[in-house]
Amino acid sequence: MEGDISLFLAIEKMMQEKMFLHQGKLVVKDVDIAGVYEVKVNELRTKIKNNRSRFPSDFMTELNKGEYTLTELGILMLGGLLKSERAKRAHIQFIEYFVHLLHENGVSVFDLIKTNGNEL
């Protein structure tokens, strides 16, 4: 795991403390994600609103009017839309965090993909 270890740890802490079950999905509130990306929550919500087609129901739900919860897919989609340097770093760390969790449990996404025995 390369990158900003303090940011990685902040993401890990936020996920452990702020994640909750909503409508059968594990989610995090937009306000908590905004804190990690260091963007104003209104900016984050505007980004979601203006890119609604990028957030299907398995990525995001609207908790209250204009207040959102995001799954891991929504968190990753949002990170790709934000432009600040901190947001770019946080986006990379979120990806590394989620992949780290898979590897920690002995799972690799590539191991799950059927390759028909293709090798170089």
Predicted region positions:
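An anion-engaging/catalytic patch
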Residues: 1-108
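Well-ordered alpha/beta subsegment
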Residues: 105-120
